[in-house]
Amino acid sequence: MDVRICLLLFLISNPSSCIQETYNEESCSTVTRGYKSVLRTGWYTNVFNLEIGNVENITCNDGPSLIDTELVLTKNALRELKTVSADQVAKESRLSSPRRRRFVLGAIALGVATAAAVTAGVALAKTIRLEGEVKAIKNALRNTNEAVSTLGNGVRVLATAVNDLKEFISKKLTPAINQNKCNIADIKMAISFGQNNRRFLNVVRQFSDSAGITSAVSLDLMTDDELVRAINRMPTSSGQISLMLNNRAMVRRKGFGILIGVYDGTVVYMVQLPIFGVIETPCWRVVAAPLCRKEKGNYACILREDQGWYCTNAGSTAYYPNKDDCEVRDDYVFCDTAAGINVALEVEQCNYNISTSKYPCKVSTGRHPVSMVALTPLGGLVSCYESVSCSIGSNKVGIIKQLGKGCTHIPNNEADTITIDNTVYQLSKVVGEQRTIKGAPVVNNFNPILFPEDQFNVALDQVFESIDRSQDLIDKSNDLLGADAKSKAGIAIAIVVLVILGIFFLLAVIYYCSRVRKTKPKHDYPATTGHSSMAYVS
């Protein structure tokens, strides 16, 4: 049945592979395969000159009007952008100070690429900000709206001039104000001013809100036509260009903008676009949930810590541990190579038999169970323990059944939702093949009483060694206690024997004395005859 589903998907959408999810009972984890990599290998720099013109010298002296309101907005935005630019320069000057890490992490908190990308982007922005570089870019755009300019450090950038607002102000708005003042009866002029001004105001707002570094590339920073032209100029293959053109939203999310500054009525900013240079290599995702064993009120719990995306690249395997390192579109996985960690090919052993793997599979340990749901591409893993209520359900009929304690894999073709207490998780509707690797949970090898306290990201064989050491200590303690008990028992027996011997000796003495008493002769006075002697001795 699963094979027929994959074949049907192939015929409908012509995918190069079918998504397959394998559940491993031994480790309470899933491995989902069938994805293809799209890996960022570089950055493409675009420098924009957003020209405003001499708007600061235009004034309205004939009372409130729509034109006057729009002029005030434009002037205030320009002043605000100059302030943001000055603050940005001050921050960049501190990049080499101990506060560097705080600045870079602040940029990442906004969702901007990686620390390395932000640092490199800021360094390039400092180069572009040099007076000679700004002039060179303006000269390259003197007779065209788009040109490739080479910076003094040899970096080639695509320069784009956006002069719609300047052209409108100089050729239409200024003559109209000079002729009729700001209170222009033609409402179309005010509407046109607002339309031409919208991009500038939105650019100011985005840089102001993000302290000079945007978290993505919006349509205001770079229109769709500008993005298409930039992608077509990227130094990569036609197949990769085609893939990026078909995933322009992803290119925007993975890019970012940096404010350069305001120069004589021109806002200069830089847009960094990712170049996705590696495609079609296999990728897979590992998801896990806590697995626990209970015995006599004690728990032994482990959780795989090698979760995340894995992609092969140039004969090696890159591991992307963080949730935001990769993003999925259909069966393509967009990842940033700078965020990847090269791991050994043997890491695959952890996906099949974690307890006998020679590779140091990383886990976390604990003695307190955690109930949770880990959503997978084709379903979900449920860890249900203690007094927590767990169930699966259907969007049509509600709860289907209650789940027992332990780890359970729920394929998305068996349920629509997973509920833990009052929290409901919606399963994906991605269609694919489901498999299960049978096996006894690895925690069955552990005695909860001997299980180590909470440990994070340790090799599983270290957990076994820790338990073995605990068992050895207990055995030695029992041996010592046994020897001590035997010693005490020997002493007690000796004392009892001595007491008994003492009693026997005492009884013997008493008996001897009594016998001697009975056999001793009596010494009485001699008996008299009753006669008295009358003799007289003189």
Swiss-Prot record:
Disulfide bridge partners, by residue number: 28-407, 60-182, 283-311, 292-301, 326-335, 350-361, 384-390
Residues covered by region (Fusion peptide): 103-124, 103-127
Glycosylation site positions: 57, 353
GO process terms (BP): fusion of virus membrane with host plasma membrane; symbiont entry into host cell
Keywords: Cleavage on pair of basic residues, Coiled coil, Disulfide bond, Fusion of virus membrane with host cell membrane, Fusion of virus membrane with host membrane, Glycoprotein, Host cell membrane, Host Golgi apparatus, Host membrane, Lipoprotein, Membrane, Palmitate, Signal, Transmembrane, Transmembrane helix, Viral envelope protein, Viral penetration into host cytoplasm, Virion, Virus entry into host cell
Family: Belongs to the paramyxoviruses fusion glycoprotein family.
Name of the molecule in the record: Fusion glycoprotein F0
